[in-house]
Regions:
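Gly/Pro-enriched, hydrophobic low-complexity segments
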Residues: 95-176
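Short solvent-exposed loop/turn micro-motifs enriched in small/polar/acidic residues
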Residues: 10-13, 33-36, 81-82, 92-94, ...
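Short amphipathic beta-strand/extended segments with alternating polar/hydrophobic composition
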Residues: 16-20, 39-45, 57-65, 112, ...
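Short, surface-exposed beta-strand-loop junctions and turns on beta-sheet-rich folds
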Residues: 34-37, 56-58, 116-118, 128
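Flexible, processing/modification-adjacent segments and terminal tails
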Residues: 42-109, 114-116, 174-177
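N-terminal mature ectodomain segment of secretory-pathway/periplasmic proteins
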Residues: 1-54
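Short, solvent-exposed loop/turn elements at beta->coil junctions and helix N-caps
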Residues: 6-7, 86-89, 134
């Protein structure tokens, strides 16, 4: 899959964005600053990478945890999670089912629109994601706007996508860092 759009950091920093993803968990995120594309994070199947802005270099992240493209609630039991419906709650003006997934001490709360079951909000210990502007892409409904909020506000961003290409084949070197 190839996601294209822009990311807004803080109040006024805005950068063109491309996110390359390939199963099972390969990923590369690129932002364009000026006219130069910069890889800011990625995973090559063995190592995670992230930009170290102090030395302006992409570096291996020893504590990187590869994530599946499928969210935890898809086939949650086989992934070791338990689920509990906590009732209904509003997200904006939409009524949502509030569902908590738990694995060990990790909890994530999901809010699904009661009308269409779209995931509108995901709350983890250190980040809240808000999904909106849903559009159909090759028969799949996907959010074209994702807002991330953190408790300390230092990692907040808004991602606005203008194009999503599914089933995209990438050159072999796409995920080599």
């Amino acid at each position: 899959i190839l996601l294209q759009g822009k990311v807004i950091l803080g109040v006024s920093e805005e950068y063109p964005l491309k996110i390359y993803q390939q199963r099972p968990n390969l990923t590369k995120t690129v932002i364009t600053v000026g006219k130069k594309e910069n890889v800011v994070e990625g995973y090559d199947g063995k190592n995670g990478y992230a930009m170290n802005y102090v030395v302006n270099k992409l570096q291996i992240q020893k504590d990187y945890v590869a994530e599946s493209f499928d969210t935890d609630f898809i086939d949650f039991e086989s992934k070791g999670f338990s689920a509990q419906v906590l009732g209904k709650e509003k997200v904006g003006d939409k009524d949502c089912f509030k569902v908590e997934l738990t694995k060990n001490v990790n909890k994530t709360v999901y809010y699904f629109d009661v009308q269409n079951y779209f995931l509108l909000k995901e709350v983890k210990k250190d980040e809240t994601l808000i999904f909106s502007d849903f559009k159909k892409v090759n028969g799949l409904v996907m959010p074209f706007r994702i807002e991330a909020n953190t408790p300390k506000k230092e990692g907040d961003y808004v991602m606005i996508l203008n194009r999503i290409d599914t089933n995209k084949a990438f050159p072999e070197n796409t995920f080599k860092f």
